[in-house]
């Protein structure tokens, strides 16, 4: 929580702790109320807008391009989200917002995702249902109102347009900051997220939008963020905990943090300090806001969600799955295979070669310059640390957890481009 004196404010440590606690509590109250309001909305129209949707899920999870992991669409979770959005049981909105119920599909020969959505569309008050109360699932506070106006296909098209618009806005803001040399790393990062998939899968949307909106806010209000960087990253962590379904959450820290470092003129040691404090703030927001959901759910539902959450954390961070031992290298292999394409290999080879040639030609390949931009290399390592502590989850769900590596792509490409763009320093 402590920022370097040159970039910080006059707020004391105790004051920052107090603001953090108030911010977390206020966020939890507002987040819960948004969900309560969303569950007060009528469901009939939402269901009618999803009547043509189940056929999309008939074959379950798919890859848009055969054998291309990066285009994988997790329709199992997608069907769960849609089923939760149209749940219409007898419980009060306050209970629904805490429990996040969905109808349990009956046994059958069809794919689980298809059965899940079909049974949800035809459900009655007596239909079997179950909660998914470990997560906030704040995406429902937006999805339910949208389903009153749009069908599933309309929402996906809107999502694609919003994501593209945000990336173009970031590119424009980089130009306004005279950071046009970062446009190539931005494009590289955008491609590594496989926007063709993130645009048409609601599950992949929250982290992308939080990351992109965070970058826009950072670039538009740089002076304010410099003064309150801890609060900015705390808010990003809270938003990620609220909206995300544990897909690739680290990008909401890593990508804005990389941009933040590009806007800084401080020394490498100060930048390492900023990486630590900003990451700590994000982590407190992410974990703290999640813990608030468990506390809130435990009180409202009269259940011990902390016990369930603890068991889930132990499972997701374990080195086993279905009795099989997982190695860290196996987890890395699963996630790296999404980028095991000739296109990426050639692109990175060319980038390294061009960097070396230009750096030598411009006489900027110096130890001083390398050390000046070395904090970016630390950020580039973040996904690998994340994979180590979430081996079970990252090994199983590599179809979307591989997107954490977009942080590495962005950080390394920024490092190389900055090295070429730097002036020679004796």
Question: What does each of the following model-derived ranges do?
Answer:
Residues 396-419:
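Hydrophobic/aromatic-rich transmembrane helices and adjacent perimembrane loops
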């Amino acid at each position: 929580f402590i920022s370097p004196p040159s970039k910080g404010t006059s707020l004391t440590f105790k004051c920052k702790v107090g603001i953090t606690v108030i911010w977390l509590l206020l966020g939890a109250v507002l987040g819960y109320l948004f969900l309560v309001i969303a569950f007060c909305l009528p469901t009939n129209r939402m269901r009618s807008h999803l009547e043509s949707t189940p056929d999309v899920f008939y074959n379950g999870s798919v890859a848009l391009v055969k054998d291309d992991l990066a285009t994988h669409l997790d329709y199992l979770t997608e069907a769960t989200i849609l089923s939760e959005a149209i749940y219409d049981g007898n419980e009060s909105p306050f209970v629904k917002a805490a429990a996040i119920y969905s109808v349990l599909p009956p046994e059958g020969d069809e794919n689980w995702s298809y059965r899940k959505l079909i049974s949800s569309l035809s459900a009655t008050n007596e239909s079997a249902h179950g909660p998914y109360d470990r997560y906030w699932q704040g995406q429902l506070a937006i999805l339910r109102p949208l389903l009153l106006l749009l069908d599933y296909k309309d929402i996906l098209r809107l999502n694609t347009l919003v994501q593209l618009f945000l990336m173009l806005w970031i590119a424009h803001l980089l130009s306004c900051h005279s950071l046009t040399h970062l446009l190539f790393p931005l494009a590289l990062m955008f491609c590594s997220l496989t926007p063709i998939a993130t645009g048409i899968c609601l599950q992949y949307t929250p982290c992308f939008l939080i990351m992109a909106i965070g970058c826009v806010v950072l670039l538009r209000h740089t002076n304010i963020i410099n003064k309150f960087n801890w609060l900015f990253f705390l808010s990003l962590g809270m938003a990620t905990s609220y909206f995300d379904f544990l897909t690739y959450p680290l990008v909401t820290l890593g990508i804005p943090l990389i941009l933040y470092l590009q806007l800084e003129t401080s020394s490498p040691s100060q930048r390492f300090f900023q990486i630590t404090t900003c990451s700590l703030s994000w982590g407190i927001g992410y974990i703290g806001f999640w813990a608030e959901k468990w506390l809130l759910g435990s009180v409202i539902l009269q259940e011990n969600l902390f016990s369930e959450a603890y068991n889930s954390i132990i499972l997701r961070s374990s080195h086993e799955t279905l009795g099989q031992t997982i190695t860290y290298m196996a987890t890395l292999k699963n996630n790296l295979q999404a980028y095991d394409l000739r296109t990426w290999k050639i692109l990175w080879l060319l980038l390294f070669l061009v960097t070396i040639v230009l750096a030598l030609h411009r006489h900027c390949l110096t130890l001083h310059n390398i050390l000046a931009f070395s904090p970016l290399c630390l950020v580039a390592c973040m996904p690998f640390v994340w994979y180590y502590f979430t081996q079970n989850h990252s090994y199983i769900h590599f179809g979307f957890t591989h997107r954490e590596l977009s942080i590495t792509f962005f950080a390394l490409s920024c490092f190389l481009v900055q090295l070429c763009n730097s002036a020679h320093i004796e």
